[in-house]
């Protein structure tokens, strides 16, 4: 997998950046990470699936219909890659905060659900997860900030509500931020800064 690593302050969090689909790559969220915490360690990973020349983290069968077998396979591969990076760069999985946008937020959800003992915190911008769970993970140690669009052209409102319920039903601590559409906004960055400050207090 292609990635960028930047060592930060040992007491600061580790941001694992997972980009969106449209033109996204491992550089896309770096300015946002810098805005959120200049001292954070950063691991930014490019999705290794190409759809019409655009980078994704897993295949889909159609808009809103995921290839579930590929989602599981790519999720496990990403988990192993993060484990290897943690060993190589000597940081703890406990310090990881996923910063995921759109497709990147979706693969982050997969990791939070399948490895709740490894990952506990995430900022998820405009996620959608139309998946029936085969397991019932215990997410009582998980905290997520969900940033959702009231008029998102990609994620219908019922799908945003489904993500909220997914985390709440499995015991996670959930904070919601509501915006208008699918693009990232300055409001979301400010809300994320506040959430991160509360998380570390």
Label for each model-derived stretch:
Residues 1-91:
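Serine-hydrolase catalytic machinery in alpha/beta-hydrolase-like enzymes
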Residues 161-164, 168, 172-201:
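C-terminal catalytic histidine-bearing segment of alpha/beta-hydrolase fold enzymes
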Residues 99-104, 108:
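Gly/Ala-rich beta-loop-alpha elbow adjacent to hydrolase catalytic centers
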């Amino acid at each position: 997998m292609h990635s960028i690593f930047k060592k930060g302050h040992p007491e600061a969090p580790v941001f694992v950046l997972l980009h969106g689909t449209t033109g996204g790559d491992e550089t896309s969220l770096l300015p946002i990470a810098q805005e959120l915490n200049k001292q954070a360690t950063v691991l930014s990973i490019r999705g290794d699936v190409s759809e019409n020349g655009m980078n994704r983290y897993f295949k889909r069968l159609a808009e809103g219909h995921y290839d579930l077998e590929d989602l599981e396979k790519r999720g496990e591969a990403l988990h192993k890659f993060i484990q290897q990076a943690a060993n190589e760069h000597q940081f703890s999985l406990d310090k990881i905060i996923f910063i995921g946008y759109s497709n990147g937020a979706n693969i982050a959800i997969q990791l939070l659900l399948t490895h709740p003992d490894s990952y506990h915190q995430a900022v998820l911008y405009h996620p959608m997860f139309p998946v029936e769970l085969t397991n019932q993970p215990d997410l009582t140690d998980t905290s997520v900030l969900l940033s959702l669009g009231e008029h998102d052209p990609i994620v219908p409102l019922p799908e945003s509500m489904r993500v909220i319920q997914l985390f709440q039903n499995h015991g996670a601590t959930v904070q919601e931020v509501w915006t208008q559409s699918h693009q990232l906004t300055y409001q979301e960055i400010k809300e994320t800064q506040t959430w991160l400050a509360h998380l570390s207090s």
